[in-house]
UniProtKB/Swiss-Prot annotation:
Identification of the protein by name: Octanoyl-[GcvH]:protein N-octanoyltransferase
Coiled coil spans: none
TM stretches of this protein: none
Gene Ontology biological-process annotations: lipoate biosynthetic process; protein modification process
Additional remark text: The reaction proceeds via a thioester-linked acyl-enzyme intermediate.
Amino acid sequence: MIHPLLQQPSYRIIDQSSLGTMFQAEQSFATDDTLCASTQERGAVLRAWVHTDTIVLGIQDARLPHLKEGIRYLHEQGFRPVVRNSGGLAVVLDDDVLNLSLILPEKDGIQIDSGYEAMTSLIQHMFQDVTNDIVPGEVVGSYCPGSFDLSIDGKKFAGISQRRVRGGVAVQIYLSVRQSGSARAEIIRDFYDLAIQGEETKFTYPTIVPETMASLEDLLGIPLTVQDVLTRAYRVLSTVSLLQNATLTADEQTMFASQLERMWKRNEPLRDIEQQLTEE
């Protein structure tokens, strides 16, 4: 049975999965904070987003002892780093990674586990015609490990995080749809190697074993695109709610501008490092 939290009266559908390189991760995180703040009034949202060749870093990643060397490596691999405004650690985003944000009004105080369970339920129902083997639980050796990693046969293809802002909850998931999950993990492994260089750190960063990660296409043995996965999400939610295509309202656009300013500020130290690298 589908998780009761998913049974909202309606969902605004905001599809930002094909905006290309002009749409940057800072804009995504600012959008989710904006939608969290308006969801009490405007109702639930499903937002889809894709970012080309981006490494999203957690707050702890920004404190790595040799961060500059890590950033240099990411640039050499063609990736743009961004520090997110929620918990978690480094993840890889590219054109074959679909991100979904469930933005839910927190009317009765949504328990943290309930948010994770709702997203897990959505993904399980999206693929129930193909597999019943999608399970939550930390996959040791994966990047950004957490108790609500999603895996099939021990190989992780998705990770879930949450962000709470002013009466709303954003439950965010990345889904590795196609291409090599282990190749993505190698990038994060090498980033940590260069950014830590064997030094002792207060925070314990994961030891990445690339073979613990895979893509949905590889795990399910069926051809998949980002659009295929998105269609499956719409199909599931349409059985329990009314779906309406939407964009940000005028009020939300105003709020978005101030949230985006916060994200730019949060990322100023990274941009400073990038400036130093270009001057070397």
